[in-house]
Amino acid sequence: MLLGGRPLHLLVLGVMGAYAGLGAYYATVARLPHPVVYAALPLGEDAAGGAPDWEAFNATAIYVAPNETDALSPALRDRARVVYARRDCRAYLWDVHFRLAAVAWLLYAAFVYARQERRMFGPFRDPAEFLTPEKYTLNYAASVLAATVIGCSYTKFAWYMAELATRRAALSRDLREDPITLAHRHPTLIALILLELGLRLGARMALFTTLGVTRAPCALVFPLYARALVWIFVLAVGALELLAATLPHIARVSGATATPARSDGGRAALGVCGACCSTVLAGIFAKALYLCLLVGGVLLFLHYERHITIFG
């Protein structure tokens, strides 16, 4: 059923899968000189109540636990750093980054499947989203088995699909004209639509949270190209999602304004073109604002992640 999804959604799913696969590959083969980072303070500053900060391994320093400082000789005390927390960054790649990328892929795959099912059987405000139910897998399988095994034509399933298409058209009309009454009469239907939207939102949030690898303490030991690839993949998915959200709206506006533009002359065409552009730009701005708010929320969480890791 996934193969019938919109091409942009399938492309997003492919990019997410490549992102998760590349993350797993890097976590397996990455050659990190020292994959552990430490939240440490120089000896003496810990007694003054200083706040520890994350740092990469320093071969000239001596890392000790807070309860081991008394055993140090005076010659080593200048090189001693008191460790309050540490993190294995290779394990971080597997336990946090890869899991988030895999969860994002699974949620988006579930969204694509749910949307595909709704395009066949469920309501849409835009009829252009409809897929013919005759392409349903069970309908095709029933007709093929009847023709090859039994040697006859089987049309009952096709009739049932046609009835579903009629029912879908009626529900879509109610969704456009009176969504509140539709929600009251068919709460399960609205719940399934909200579940579909929730799957997509959850996939986006999980994907954007993977940006934590560029700001987490482990970013100190990851090379620049690895952090750049994370941003490239996430921004590519964000751009494709923005494109998938705006292209249907552009097509609807273009289709609605095509006839007046041809019949009213140059002035009408200019007015329609201006209205079309303003509507499209407003939609793009709204989607971009939503994307910025989502990224901002994730980055705000990552800003406090260091303190949560050290003191929580």
UniProtKB/Swiss-Prot annotation:
Spans through the membrane: 92-112, 188-208, 228-248, 281-301
Extracellular side: 21-91, 209-227, 302-312
Residues modified by glycosylation: N58, N67
UniProt keyword Transcription, yes or no: no
GO biological process: fusion of viral membrane with host outer nuclear membrane; symbiont-mediated induction of syncytium formation
Signal peptide range: 1-20
Assigned keywords, A-Z: Glycoprotein, Host cell membrane, Host endosome, Host Golgi apparatus, Host membrane, Membrane, Signal, Syncytium formation induced by viral infection, Transmembrane, Transmembrane helix, Viral primary envelope fusion with host outer nuclear membrane, Viral release from host cell
Membrane topology of the entry: Multi-pass membrane protein
Cytoplasmic topological domain: 113-187, 249-280
Cellular location(s): Host cell membrane; Host endosome membrane; Host Golgi apparatus membrane
Protein family per UniProt: Belongs to the alphaherpesvirinae glycoprotein K family.
Task of the protein: Glycoprotein that probably modulates membrane fusion events during secondary envelopment of cytoplasmic capsids that bud into specific trans-Golgi network (TGN)-derived membranes.
Name of the molecule in the record: Envelope glycoprotein K
